């Protein structure tokens, strides 16, 4: 049996973004478009997407990738968003994140990546 305990399976990038305008965080269609476009622009294979608009506000978007996933969760009432990208292929999740960050238009974020 092969020991996979120390095997590198991919890179998981976690991003928390602050001071984002309410309107950007509550725009369901635009968030879905940005997430899907960021993945496709960086050459990731989009298998499917799921988007949910919460009442009274907030959006969750998940993009299932051939290489793993991107998920995005917004809190318009707190002017923040958290998203993560896991890639198990050769693509760098940071390159996808820059496209998403461009939409949210703030320099107030924390980005951490983890080898998995």
For each feature predicted by the language model, list its residue ranges:
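Polybasic/polar functional segments that serve as interface/processing modules
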Residues: 1-116
């Amino acid at each position: 049996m092969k020991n996979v305990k120390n095997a590198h399976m991919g890179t998981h990038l976690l991003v928390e973004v602050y001071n984002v305008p309410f309107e950007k965080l509550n725009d369901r269609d635009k968030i879905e478009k940005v997430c899907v476009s960021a993945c496709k622009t960086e050459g990731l294979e989009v298998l499917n997407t799921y988007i949910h608009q919460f009442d009274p506000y907030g959006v969750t978007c998940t993009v299932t990738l051939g290489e793993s996933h991107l998920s995005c969760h917004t809190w318009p009432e707190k002017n923040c968003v958290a998203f993560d990208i896991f890639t198990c292929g050769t693509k760098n999740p940071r390159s996808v994140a820059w496209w998403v960050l461009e939409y949210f238009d703030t320099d107030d974020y924390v980005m951490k990546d983890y080898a998995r």
